Amino acid sequence: DEPLDSKHNEWLMKNVLSDGGQFTGVSDLVTKYGLVPSTVQPETYNSNNTRKIDELIILKLKEYALELRAMNADKKAKKDKLEARKVEMLSQVYRMLVLAYGEPVQEFTYTLRDVNGKEISTETYTPKSFYEKYVGKDLKNSYVMLMNDPSREFFKIYEIENDRHVMDGANWKYINLPIEDIKKIAIESIKDSTMMYFSCDVGKFLYS
């Protein structure tokens, strides 16, 4: 019901989706849907060159947002009609994604081999059962995100609104620490063979 030119809606229309993300989003996705080996669902041209499909999805979502706003502005519009139309819209977006990336795998057979290529076992999995067997950890509750943001006070937890990969997932939440502390934690994680996910803001260097 907010005006289209409100600060909130203006931000949403400028940030429809982003091609990337962070650990919270990944943990939400794999916990909900699972994982498959790349041999089961290989990369496509579009998964290696995502800009064009991103642009098409963004345009389609903006179009749908304006249509839903117009329907909602009609006093006679019923909620069930709005919901039904939204489902139709999401079905079209899903179709676009499937055409670009392929239909999500529901079940597959996977052969585990040793370093010499000798077969160890062959089993049938769903993406969820594969994730549970070969990852197993509770990614959503076993890890925390650390960040070095000098523009904000250190030793506090921050949450980024509307930064999530799934609607029922969690926003990007992190503990803000001095870079010296993060370096020490990174060194300790290497020493005890615990993998540490790492990313950095390099956008300003891409075209320098």
Label every model-predicted segment.
Residues 1-208:
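Structured alpha-helical subdomains that flank or immediately precede key functional sites
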